[in-house]
C-alpha cells in the first residue's frame, strides 16, 4: 500500500504527462484544434486560441509554456522548440484571477505546488506576490539543459508599466488584454524573436483585438 501511495504521489507531480498522449481520455485525437495551435508556433510569432468556456484554452496555454520552461518536449511535438532556458511572462485580468487560474494551472493549489502542469521535481523555487495572499510572482524551473528558466506572473490591472523593461522569450496572455499591454508584450519579445501566446474567450465580442486574428471575418 505504501508503494502504491508513493506512486500515486509521484504521478500527481507529473500532471503534464496526462495531457495529449497517443491514447486515453486526453489523447491528441480529441484535441485537434489545440494541436493545430501548437504546430502553428513553428511558423508564427503571434497566435491566439479562441474558444468557449471550459474548452481547454488555459490548459493548452499552460501546457505549451511548461514545455518551453522545462525543455522536455514530447516526441510528437512539432511546434516551436527552445534549446535553452527561457524567460516567460504570463498574465491574466487581475492579480487574483492570475493567481486562481494561471498560477493554479502551472503550480497547483497553494501549499501543494508541483501538482499543476510544471512537474514538482523541476520547480526550484517560487517568489511570493506582494499583497496577494498565496500569490506567486516568480517561478524558477529546472531546464533539461541544466540551466534555469524563469516565469513571471503579472496581471493586466497592474498597467502597461508592469510589462516594460525585461526581454522575454514567451509571453502568455490568458483572456483578452488591453491593446497597450499586448503591444508591450510584443515589444518584450522583439529582441528575442520570441512567442506571444493568447488564450481567450471573446467575452467582449468582436473587438479590434479579436478581429486581428480573424482575417476572414474582416469587412470588405
Residue spans of the language-model regions?
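Phosphate/NTP-binding elements of NTP-utilizing enzymes
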Residues: 1-220
Amino acid at each position: 500500500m505504501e508503494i502504491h501511495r508513493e506512486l500515486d504521489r509521484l504521478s500527481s507531480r507529473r500532471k503534464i504527462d496526462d495531457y495529449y498522449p497517443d491514447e486515453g481520455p486526453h489523447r491528441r485525437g480529441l484535441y485537434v484544434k489545440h494541436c493545430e495551435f501548437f504546430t502553428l508556433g513553428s511558423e508564427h510569432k503571434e497566435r491566439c486560441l479562441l474558444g468557449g468556456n471550459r474548452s481547454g484554452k488555459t490548459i493548452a496555454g499552460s501546457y505549451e509554456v511548461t514545455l518551453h520552461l522545462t525543455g522536455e518536449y514530447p516526441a510528437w511535438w512539432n511546434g516551436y522548440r527552445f534549446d535553452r532556458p527561457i524567460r516567460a511572462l504570463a498574465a491574466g485580468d487581475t492579480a487574483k484571477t492570475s493567481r486562481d487560474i494561471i498560477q493554479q494551472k502551472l503550480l497547483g493549489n497553494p501549499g501543494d505546488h508541483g501538482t499543476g502542469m510544471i512537474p514538482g521535481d523541476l520547480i526550484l523555487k517560487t517568489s511570493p506576490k506582494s499583497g496577494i495572499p498565496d500569490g506567486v510572482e516568480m517561478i524558477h524551473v529546472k531546464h533539461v539543459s541544466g540551466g534555469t528558466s524563469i516565469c513571471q506572473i503579472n496581471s493586466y490591472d497592474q498597467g502597461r508599466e508592469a510589462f516594460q523593461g525585461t526581454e522575454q522569450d514567451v509571453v502568455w496572455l490568458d483572456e483578452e488584454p488591453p491593446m497597450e499591454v499586448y503591444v508591450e508584450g510584443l515589444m518584450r519579445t522583439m529582441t528575442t524573436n520570441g512567442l506571444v501566446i493568447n488564450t481567450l474567450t471573446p467575452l467582449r465580442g468582436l473587438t479590434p483585438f479579436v478581429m486581428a486574428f480573424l482575417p476572414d471575418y474582416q469587412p470588405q
